[in-house]
From Swiss-Prot:
Pfam families: Ribosomal_S13. Residues 94-118 are annotated as: Disordered. It comes from the Bacteria. One of its GO terms (cellular component) is cytosol. One of its GO terms (molecular function) is structural constituent of ribosome. Part of the 30S ribosomal subunit. Forms a loose heterodimer with protein S19. Forms two bridges to the 50S subunit in the 70S ribosome. GO terms for biological process: translation. Located at the top of the head of the 30S subunit, it contacts several helices of the 16S rRNA. In the 70S ribosome it contacts the 23S rRNA (bridge B1a) and protein L5 of the 50S subunit (bridge B1b), connecting the 2 subunits; these bridges are implicated in subunit movement. Contacts the tRNAs in the A and P-sites. Keywords: Ribonucleoprotein, Ribosomal protein, RNA-binding, rRNA-binding, tRNA-binding. This is Small ribosomal subunit protein uS13.
Length: 118
């Protein structure tokens, strides 16, 4: 197992697909990382040399991924809630933030239905 950004990247997958297992790296960013590191995107991780894996590590370290990114996102949400802006209030009340309807849908965000007690 190759270890990049503190994550065991799957060795049986192509470099582009394997990089997407790191939080904060999608397909387009994975292609960009492979291009910067001069690694063929269709080459499997187990077939990469140590220098190529090290080049991938070096390029990935330039981006904010995994724990740092999770911390940044949670701090951004906390900042919105502290400001008391509309988006922060929606986060605080566990409701959809981006204008979706809530009369009939939004069950994932609101949680299971609670019966009305009479």
């Amino acid at each position: 197992m190759a270890r990049i950004a503190g994550i065991n990247v799957p060795t049986q997958k192509h470099a582009v697909i394997a990089l997407t297992s790191i939080y904060g790296i999608g397909t387009s960013r994975a292609k960009e990382i492979c291009a910067k590191a001069n690694v063929a995107p269709d080459k499997k991780i187990r077939d990469l040399s140590d220098s190529e894996v090290e080049a991938l590590r070096q390029v990935v370290s330039e981006y904010q991924v995994e724990g740092d990114l999770r911390r940044q996102v949670s701090m951004d949400i906390k900042r919105l809630m502290d400001l008391g802006c509309f988006r922060g209030l929606r986060h605080r009340r566990s409701l959809p933030v981006r204008g979706q309807r809530t009369k009939t849908n939004a069950r994932t965000r609101k949680g299971p239905r609670r019966p009305i007690k009479r």
